[in-house]
C-alpha cells in the first residue's frame, strides 16, 4: 500500500469506529487478528451510542464521501444481504455534494466537443444548475436555434478517486472474507465487483443517453409522461446535452396546489406510468425519487409527469412479469399457497423448500397488511415483506425485481403524498388483469402465432427442401439403425458362444481336478488342457 492509501484506510477505519460500526461484527464471529486490531485502536470510541445502528451506518457513509454514499445506495437494494432496519436507512442516503469549479466544467466540455463552447452554444452559465458526486449540470442555448438546453458533464477528477477507494474496498473485502467466517456468505468481494461495474457504468453518459431515448420513444405523444430530448450529436462519453425543461418538483405540494393541479389525477397517473413501463414496455425508470420527477405546469387540470436522470433503469422478461402479476393477484386473493409454490417453481428458492412452511411464513407477515382496506395497502411493502420472508428461505433475490420494488415504493410514496386517498389497487388491477389475459387463453395463442408469423413466412419457401432433407436423413438414420441392430445381434451371438465355451472349459477344469485326486493323471492332463483351450476360445469370442 502507498502512504496515501494507508492514510485513507486509517481514516475509513476511524470513521467506522467513531460511529460504532464494529457492532455489525459480533466479537464471537471474529478471528484473532481483527480482535487485536480493535484493541490496538482503543482510543477511538463510539461517539453516537444513543443513535440506532442503521442511522449510524448511514451517517458514516455520508462522512466518507461520494463513493461510499453510492455504495450505500446500491446496498439498500440488496435486501437479500441486509436486514430491513439497515436497508431502510441506506435508502435515505442522498447524493448531494458541493459543486466543482465552473471553469473546470467548461474546459471538460470543450475537450469532449473538440472546440470552444461558443461554436455550438450561447448564454452558457458557468454557475451549475445542479451538482452530484459523479456529474454536474450547466445551462446554455443552442447557437443555431436558441433552444434552451442543459449540459451534464462528468467530474474531471472523479475516476482516480473512485479507483483509489475501490482498491481499498477490495482489500477490506478480502480481509473480511479471511478473518470473519460468518461474513463469507455475504460474498463481500462479489459485492464490490458488482458495485465497481455499476459505478464505472455511471461514468459513461452514453448509457444514460440511450436509456433516456428509449423511455422517450416508449411515451412519445403520451399525456402521462414526458422525457426530455437528448441532443445526441453533441453528446459523448463524458458529456450529455439535452433539452431544458421547466416544471414543479413533484414533492412541492404547496406549489402544485397553488398552480391548481388536479392532485388525484396526477397521483393516479404516477401509478399508471409505472405499470405501463412494467407490463407494456418491460423497461422502467428505476430512480424515480422526488429529485428526478417534475410536473408540467402548463395544463394543471391534465397534469403530466416529467422524468429526468435515466442513469438507472430496469428491464423485465416475460417470466419476471408473470412472477409479479401472479404474485400480486395471489396476494389479493389471499392464495398464499400459490405464492409459495410460484417461488419454488421459478427456482428462486431451493427445490427442497417445504412449501407449507414457506406458505405459513408468507401468511404470517402478509395477513396483517391485507386486513386493511384495499385502498390503504402498499404494493411496495407487500413485495418488501415477501423479499424479507423469502430471504429466510435462501431466496436468491433478482436485481431487476429489487429495483422494481424500490421504484414502486417511490411511486407509492409520491402518489399518497399527492393524494392520500389514492387506491393503488383500483389503478393497478386493470394492468394486471389485461396482461394476464394476454398470456393465457385464445388471445395469447393468437398473439404468439402472430409473433411467429414472419418467421414461418420466411421459412415457407424452404419447406419442400426441409421435408426432402428430413426424409433423406430419416432414410440414412434407418440404414444406420439397421446396421447397429445387426451388429448388436452379432455381438449377442458372440457373447452367448463365449459364455458356452467358458462354461465347458470350467467344467473340464473341475473334472481334471477330480481325476487328479483319484491319481488318473493322463485323463486329468487331457481334461485340463482341453478346458484351458475352451477358456482361450471363450476369451477370443468375448473380444469379438
From Swiss-Prot:
Organism from which the protein derives: Aliivibrio fischeri (strain MJ11)
Pathway it works in: Cofactor biosynthesis; ubiquinone biosynthesis [regulation]
Gene transcribed to yield this protein: ubiB
PANTHER family assigned: CHAPERONE-ACTIVITY OF BC1 COMPLEX CABC1 -RELATED, PROTEIN ACTIVITY OF BC1 COMPLEX KINASE 7, CHLOROPLASTIC
Gene Ontology cellular component terms for the protein in this record: plasma membrane
One Pfam entry name: ABC1
NCBIfam families: PRK04750.1, UbiB
Protein name per the record: Probable protein kinase UbiB
EC number(s) on file: 2.7.-.-
Family: Belongs to the ABC1 family. UbiB subfamily.
Amino acid at each position: 500500500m502507498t502512504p496515501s492509501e494507508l492514510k485513507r484506510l486509517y481514516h475509513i477505519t476511524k470513521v467506522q469506529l467513531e460511529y460504532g460500526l464494529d457492532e455489525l461484527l459480533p466479537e464471537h464471529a471474529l478471528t484473532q487478528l481483527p480482535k487485536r486490531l480493535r484493541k490496538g485502536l482503543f482510543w477511538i470510541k463510539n461517539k453516537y451510542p444513543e443513535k440506532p445502528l442503521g442511522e449510524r451506518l448511514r451517517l458514516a457513509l455520508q462522512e466518507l464521501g461520494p463513493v461510499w454514499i453510492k455504495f450505500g445506495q446500491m446496498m439498500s437494494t440488496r435486501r437479500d444481504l441486509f436486514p430491513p432496519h439497515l436497508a431502510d436507512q441506506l435508502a435515505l442516503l442522498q447524493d448531494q455534494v458541493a459543486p466543482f469549479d465552473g471553469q473546470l466544467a467548461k474546459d471538460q466540455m470543450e475537450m469532449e466537443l473538440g472546440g470552444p463552447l461558443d461554436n455550438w452554444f450561447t448564454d452558457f452559465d458557468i454557475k451549475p444548475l445542479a451538482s452530484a458526486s459523479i456529474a454536474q449540470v450547466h445551462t446554455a442555448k443552442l447557437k443555431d436555434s436558441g433552444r434552451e438546453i442543459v449540459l451534464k458533464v462528468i467530474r474531471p477528477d472523479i475516476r482516480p478517486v473512485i479507483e483509489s477507494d475501490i482498491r481499498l474496498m477490495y482489500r477490506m473485502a478480502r480481509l473480511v472474507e479471511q478473518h470473519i467466517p460468518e461474513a463469507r456468505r455475504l460474498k463481500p468481494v462479489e459485492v464490490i465487483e458488482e458495485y465497481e461495474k455499476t459505478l464505472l457504468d455511471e461514468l459513461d453518459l452514453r448509457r444514460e443517453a440511450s436509456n433516456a431515448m428509449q423511455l422517450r420513444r416508449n411515451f412519445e405523444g403520451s399525456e402521462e409522461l414526458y422525457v426530455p430530448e437528448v441532443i445526441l450529436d453533441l453528446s459523448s462519453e463524458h458529456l450529455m446535452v439535452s433539452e431544458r425543461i421547466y416544471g414543479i418538483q413533484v414533492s412541492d405540494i404547496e406549489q402544485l396546489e397553488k398552480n391548481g393541479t388536479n392532485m388525484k389525477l396526477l397521483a393516479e397517473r404516477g401509478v399508471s406510468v409505472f405499470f405501463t413501463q412494467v407490463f407494456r414496455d418491460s423497461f422502467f425508470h428505476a430512480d424515480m425519487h422526488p429529485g428526478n420527477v417534475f410536473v408540467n405546469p402548463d395544463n394543471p387540470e391534465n397534469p403530466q409527469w416529467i422524468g429526468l436522470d435515466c442513469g438507472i433503469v430496469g428491464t423485465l422478461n416475460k417470466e419476471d412479469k408473470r412472477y409479479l402479476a401472479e404474485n400480486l393477484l395471489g396476494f389479493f386473493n389471499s392464495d398464499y399457497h400459490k405464492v409459495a409454490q410460484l417461488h419454488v417453481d421459478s427456482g428462486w428458492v431451493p427445490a427442497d423448500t417445504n412449501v407449507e412452511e414457506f406458505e405459513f411464513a408468507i401468511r404470517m407477515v402478509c395477513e396483517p397488511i391485507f386486513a386493511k382496506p384495499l385502498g390503504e395497502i402498499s404494493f411496495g411493502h407487500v413485495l418488501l415483506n415477501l423479499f424479507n420472508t423469502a430471504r429466510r428461505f435462501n431466496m436468491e433475490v433478482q436485481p431487476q425485481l429489487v429495483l422494481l420494488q424500490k421504484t414502486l415504493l417511490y411511486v407509492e410514496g409520491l402518489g399518497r403524498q399527492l393524494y392520500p386517498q389514492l387506491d393503488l389497487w383500483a389503478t393497478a388491477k386493470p394492468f394486471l388483469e389485461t396482461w394476464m389475459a394476454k398470456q393465457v387463453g385464445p388471445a395469447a395463442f393468437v398473439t404468439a402465432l402472430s409473433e411467429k408469423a414472419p418467421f414461418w413466412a420466411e421459412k415457407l419457401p424452404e419447406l419442400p427442401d426441409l421435408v426432402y432433407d428430413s426424409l433423406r436423413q430419416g432414410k440414412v438414420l434407418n440404414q444406420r439403425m439397421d446396421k447397429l441392430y445387426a451388429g448388436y445381434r452379432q455381438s449377442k451371438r458372440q457373447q452367448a458362444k463365449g459364455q458356452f465355451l467358458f462354461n465347458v472349459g470350467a467344467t473340464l477344469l473341475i473334472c481334471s481336478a477330480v481325476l487328479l485326486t483319484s491319481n488318473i493323471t493322463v485323463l486329468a492332463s487331457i481334461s485340463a488342457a482341453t478346458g484351458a483351450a475352451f477358456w482361450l476360445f471363450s476369451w477370443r469370442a468375448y473380444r469379438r
